[in-house]
């Protein structure tokens, strides 16, 4: 039986406008140049880019480096950007450097502001109800099993892209997507629930720290029908 639509979730309209920036490219470039000199780089360039996800890309040689920084940071205070630049240059130097707490606090403070842009760039509609399944039902079953806390919050979406992954998430934006190929009749509940739980494990583990992946793996192993779900996923040509 086809799942009926209930009252839909809010639909976000992207509000990003580069004129709203409080940090121009010139200031970002200056911060990265100043930090870079402390690490032996005398020619450093940096600018913001509208990446769908938070990320930093760079090219470098002996004395020069060029950075493209997610524009989700184009309203960040100098302290956050300086700490970010220091962490990146530490990583370039070969050290296993975690991003600083200031960056994580900033993302938490501006999460709601960045959500419309994130959803638009990823081409996502923040609605949990699909044709046959409601992702909120998965969350409720996981709560009933005691696998996730009752106060955990995230945005649930169906992903209509061509990805073979059963689910994906942005830990920073707390957005969890499930492949629309699972929104079909006959898909076992334990598979749907595992697709959601596997990514909720990452949301519960946090971000930016090397220990986060290990904690997500530990939580993932607690799912009662994990082996059966993985077998079904593999048999249907999909991956985690």
Regions flagged by a language model, labelled:
Residues 1-193, 203-240:
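Active-site-proximal or metal-binding-adjacent scaffold patches in catalytic folds
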Residues 199:
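Walker B catalytic acidic pair
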Residues 196:
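A conserved beta-strand element that flanks and buttresses the S-adenosyl-L-methionine
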């Amino acid at each position: 039986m086809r799942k009926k639509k209930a009252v839909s979730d809010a639909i976000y309209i992207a509000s990003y406008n580069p004129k709203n920036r409080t940090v121009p490219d010139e200031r970002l470039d200056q911060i990265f140049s100043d930090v870079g000199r402390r690490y032996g780089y005398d020619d450093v360039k940096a600018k913001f880019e509208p990446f769908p996800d938070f990320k930093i890309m760079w090219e470098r040689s002996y004395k020069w480096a060029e950075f493209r920084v997610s524009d989700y940071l184009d309203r960040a205070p100098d302290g956050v950007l300086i700490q970010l630049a220091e962490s990146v240059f530490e990583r370039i130097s070969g050290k296993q450097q975690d991003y600083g707490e200031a960056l994580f606090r900033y993302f938490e403070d501006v999460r709601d502001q960045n959500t419309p842009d994130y959803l638009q760039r990823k081409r996502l509609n923040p609605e949990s109800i699909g044709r046959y399944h409601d992702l909120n039902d998965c969350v409720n079953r996981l709560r009933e099993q005691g696998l996730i806390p009752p106060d955990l919050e995230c945005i649930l979406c169906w992903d209509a892209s061509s990805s073979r992954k059963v689910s994906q998430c942005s830990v920073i934006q707390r957005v969890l997507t499930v492949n629309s190929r699972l929104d079909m009749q006959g898909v076992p509940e334990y598979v749907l629930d595992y697709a959601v739980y596997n990514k909720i494990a990452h949301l519960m583990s946090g971000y930016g720290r090397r220990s986060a992946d290990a904690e997500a793996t530990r939580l993932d192993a607690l799912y009662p029908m994990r082996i059966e779900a993985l077998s079904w996923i593999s048999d249907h040509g999909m991956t985690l």
